[in-house]
Amino acid sequence: MITAQISHVAFLAARIILMILFLLSFLVTAFFVERLLFFRKRLLKDLSPLLSALELAQSKTEIRAVLENAGRSETALILKGLQETNATEASFRKTVQAFLYPERKQWERFSVFLGSVGNNAPFIGLLGTVLGILKSFADLSLVASGGPQVVMAGISEALIATAVGLLVAIPSVIFFNICKVYIKRSLNHVNALMDMIGAKNLF
């Protein structure tokens, strides 16, 4: 009786784990697509044309016009630093850094989730496999005939959970790393823009 209950509970738990993994797979894909669209819409793709335009600017007014024309998150941060008419270069940089913190949180949205799924999905799949194996041995004690065939069939089915866990984890890690590349590139863009404007000695 207890063995039958163990088999039933292990079966249900293994199925729930597979459902969780499939749900995580859907969420990972949805969040990554959202992030990819966000990055392509809001962040600078190539900084070179903007730096060339800024190099030709001779005043803060011209710099603001160039930045406003770009219309990206990085340029919006620089514009906030240029709001004060009598700002020094030091205060300009501090203002940009202050506004960068909340902006960076927007850039990093869902990154923790993607990284966590990438790190933990294999273990969730492994748990499903352990439960599947537990069910197989419980079934073996309930079946009078069948012997090793019952166990092997159950183990083969249980290993699906590990495979699914890996199939969820690998794309999650790839997506997480892609997001990190976008964020790091944008941070470098902000620093490069500050350096370019600071080098013009307009403060």
Language-model-derived ranges and their functions:
Residues 1-50:
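Hydrophobic membrane-targeting segments
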Residues 7-14, 101-118, 149-160:
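Alpha-helical membrane-interface segments at transmembrane helix boundaries
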Residues 14, 27, 33-34, 118-121, ...:
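Residue-level micro-sites within transmembrane alpha helices that shape
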Residues 20-27, 121-124, 128-131, 166:
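Residue-level signal for the membrane-embedded core of alpha-helical transmembrane segments
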Residues 28-31, 37-38, 106, 160, ...:
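Hydrophobic side chains within alpha-helical segments
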Residues 42-146, 174-203:
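Predominantly long cytosolic amphipathic alpha-helical stalk/bundle segments
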Residues 158-174:
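Hydrophobic alpha-helical transmembrane segments of polytopic membrane proteins
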